[in-house]
Amino acid sequence: MQHLEEIIANASAAIEAAESLVVLDEVRVQYLGKKGELTAQLQSLGKLPPEERREAGQEINKAKGAVQQAIAARKDALQRAELEAKLAAETIDVTLPGRRIENGGLHPVTRTVERIEQFFGELGFNTESGPEIEDAFHNFDALNIAEDHPARTDHDTFFFNPDLMLRTHTSGVQIRTMENGKPPFRFIAPGRVYRNDYDQTHTPMFHQVEGMLVDENVNFAQLKGILHDFLCNFFEEEVEVRFRPSYFPFTEPSAEVDVKGKNGKWLEVLGCGMVHPNVLRSVGIDPEKYSGFAFGMGVERLTMLRYGVNDLRAFFENDLRFLKQFK
């Protein structure tokens, strides 16, 4: 055991003398490693008489534990000293201004959708949504769109198969909402729609908001009043609005809505009309009792008019120089 005490004393001295973590690890290996001095002591127990092995093993394990504790304590002290030296070497100028956190901003299309939702929400319109992959019934048939209508061709619509396609408008949401409820209805349906078109004023994917009100004694004058108020609210000024006769399969009568620009020219902004009786019949609503109006608008077009953007494609090119203007 005298030799064991000598090993402990030497180990303690080496641990205290270690001035770095690297040197301390070398001391650990010297005494506790696979070929370390204390490990060798444990391996030599087999040479002792059986009656001495137990006591000797206890003494060696006790010594091993003491060395491990001493190494852990020295390691902690060295790490603290290293951190203190690092902090002392680093200087912080507390007079420097802080780093400015740059806030993000909503996309202009998102801003427009939120403005539309807020206006109609204040009039009691709910916001509904539906699938972007639509079937022929909800996208065409229930909306009184005939089999030979141009919208049913590959030229205008992205088909998966003859009965499944990317929706060309959010009107399918109107059908689904009426299928799942009973009149009266008052809601808008914003969302992405898809058409096979790409140029300065068209993209294959764009955003649309359609609205519908179905109740007893609904008339065109109510539709005109709501849309006039909406456009004045959206452009934040009193705008001159006109309604032109038009044609949509799902409304009768139908109209295009224009606003007069600052240059005196009329600009088309949305379409509308009274819900066609066939559309009401397709969802089990009696057109003799109920009537309704519907309207639809392209979000990007309204956004272009509001912010003076000339190219629709700019909204989807993710150019921060463009998008930062709307923060």
Swiss-Prot record:
Cofactor comment text: Binds 2 magnesium ions per tetramer.
Cofactor(s) needed: Mg(2+)
InterPro entries: aa-tRNA-synth_II, aa-tRNA-synth_II/BPL/LPL, Phe-tRNA-synth_IIc_asu, Phe-tRNA_ligase_II_N, Phe_tRNA_ligase_alpha1_bac, Phenylalanyl-tRNA_Synthase, tRNA-bd_arm
Membrane-spanning intervals of the chain: none
Origin superkingdom: Bacteria
EC numbers on record: 6.1.1.20
Top-level class of the enzyme under EC nomenclature: ligase
CC per GO annotation: cytoplasm
Positions bound to Mg(2+): E252
Alphabetic keyword roster: Aminoacyl-tRNA synthetase, ATP-binding, Cytoplasm, Ligase, Magnesium, Metal-binding, Nucleotide-binding, Protein biosynthesis
GO MF assignments: ATP binding; magnesium ion binding; phenylalanine-tRNA ligase activity; tRNA binding
Main location: cytoplasm
Catalytic activity: tRNA(Phe) + L-phenylalanine + ATP = L-phenylalanyl-tRNA(Phe) + AMP + diphosphate + H(+)
Localisation: Cytoplasm
A Pfam family the protein falls into: Phe_tRNA-synt_N
Gene Ontology BP annotations: phenylalanyl-tRNA aminoacylation
Subunit structure of this chain's protein: Tetramer of two alpha and two beta subunits.
Record-stated family: Belongs to the class-II aminoacyl-tRNA synthetase family. Phe-tRNA synthetase alpha subunit type 1 subfamily.
Record's protein name: Phenylalanine--tRNA ligase alpha subunit
UniProt source species: Vibrio campbellii (strain ATCC BAA-1116)
